[in-house]
Amino acid sequence: MTQQHTVSPPHVIDEDKHWWFSSRTRALLSMLDGIVPRRDNRILDVGCGAGNMFHHLGRYGAVVGLENNPKPIAIAQKRGYDVRLGQAEDMPFEERTFELITALDVIEHCADDARVLSECYRVCAPGGLLVITTPAHQWLWSHNDEINHHFRRYSSAELRSKLAQAGFHVKRLAFNNFFVFPLAAMLIRLRQERGDTPDLAAPDTDDDAYQVEMEPTSPPVNAVLTGVGWVEATLLHWVNLPVGTGIICIAAKE
């Protein structure tokens, strides 16, 4: 779950205007639009934070959120969202409840990711879908992973294997941040070799964590990277990009 996962309350940053979040959202929706068969699904957003994805996921049905941090839950409830307090490892829902489950940048925060995937399978309806986004490539591990309390980054093979063990069948698996990957990988490897840490200081509290991580990029850079995200999302509607800093996976319970 997201007890240490960063969140983005409205007074800190608008995620829809930040290139990283907007690019992930567009890529995700572009892939889902070609797979989700109808618009009246029961949807669960695991580790939903303050509910920043609710208005996007609402195009596919009625959304319920699961979060274990009371602070973002309070923000979500002020927005009028249905968010339940609970753990991803022990979800407070009946079996076969949801046709669509999302866990967006969640499982890397979980010590027992297999238990989380098993719970997703339990509450997923037959024929339902599980959508996961998560950081890619353990060799890209950096100080940013540490300050965000990640346990791991994933290879495509590892994620496929863990989903299969939980009972899911992968329908699509693609990488995102394809176009920024070469520069990002180069900078991370240089920092690893020199023992440098990024400019972001390790936060002292959860409140500091999301404010530090969500520090916006400069408007010109943000605009360019947002445009790159539009191009990538268009491509992802048709093809699975072979490399990137993150993974987007859509798996089915059959």
Show the residue positions of the predicted features.
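Short, glycine-/aromatic-enriched active-site segment of Class I SAM-dependent methyltransferases
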Residues: 13, 130-152, 156-164
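A C-terminal cap/extension of S-adenosyl-L-methionine-dependent methyltransferases
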Residues: 180-254
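Conserved N-terminal segment of class I S-adenosyl-L-methionine
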Residues: 1-96, 100-104, 117, 215, ...
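A short glycine-rich, Lys/Arg-flanked "PGG" loop and its adjoining helix->strand segment in the class I
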Residues: 114-129
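Residues lining the SAM
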Residues: 104-107, 133
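Conserved S-adenosyl-L-methionine
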Residues: 168-178
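Short conserved AdoMet
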Residues: 58, 77, 111, 125, ...
